[in-house]
Amino acid sequence: MQQEPDRNEQGYCSSPPSSNKQDSSDDTKKIQRREKNRIAAQKSRQRQTQKADSLHIESENLERLNSALRGEISGLREELKYLTCVLSTHQPVCVLGPTKPQAILPHVGSTRYQH
């Protein structure tokens, strides 16, 4: 005569008895792993936020520097216009006679000084 497997009230076969200590140890390890993972994820999010903040600050600083440099370029262009005008006004009345720009400003036209 064959022995029938143990059945619970719903008619399912019961699983073989398991060690409560093993389950408890596995649960503890799961909880510890989840906690460790949660902390690692939190640190990762903090680093990501700090990096984004740092990039934002750097971007703002570069924008300010860019604006200042554009202002300086604008000022230098205005000064160039003014000096060109002064020179063109002075040339007709200059007693020294016509001179080549290279004699006055040797670096003008030289590729060595161009940026």
UniProtKB/Swiss-Prot annotation:
One of its GO terms (biological process) is lymphoid progenitor cell differentiation. PROSITE patterns: BZIP (PS50217), BZIP_BASIC (PS00036). This is Basic leucine zipper transcriptional factor ATF-like. Pfam families: bZIP_1. Residues 1-57 are annotated as: Disordered. Residues 29-51 are annotated as: Basic motif. Belongs to the bZIP family. It is found in: Nucleus; Cytoplasm. CDD domains: bZIP_BATF. GO terms for cellular component: cytoplasm; nucleus. Residues 27-90 form the bZIP domain. Residues 55-83 are annotated as: Leucine-zipper. Transmembrane segments: none annotated. Keywords: Activator, Cytoplasm, Differentiation, DNA-binding, Nucleus, Repressor, Transcription, Transcription regulation. Its main location: nucleus. GO terms for molecular function: DNA-binding transcription factor activity; sequence-specific DNA binding. Signal peptide: none annotated. AP-1 family transcription factor that controls the differentiation of lineage-specific cells in the immune system: specifically mediates the differentiation of T-helper 17 cells (Th17), follicular T-helper cells (TfH), CD8(+) dendritic cells and class-switch recombination (CSR) in B-cells. It comes from the Eukaryota. InterPro entries: AP-1, bZIP, bZIP_sf.
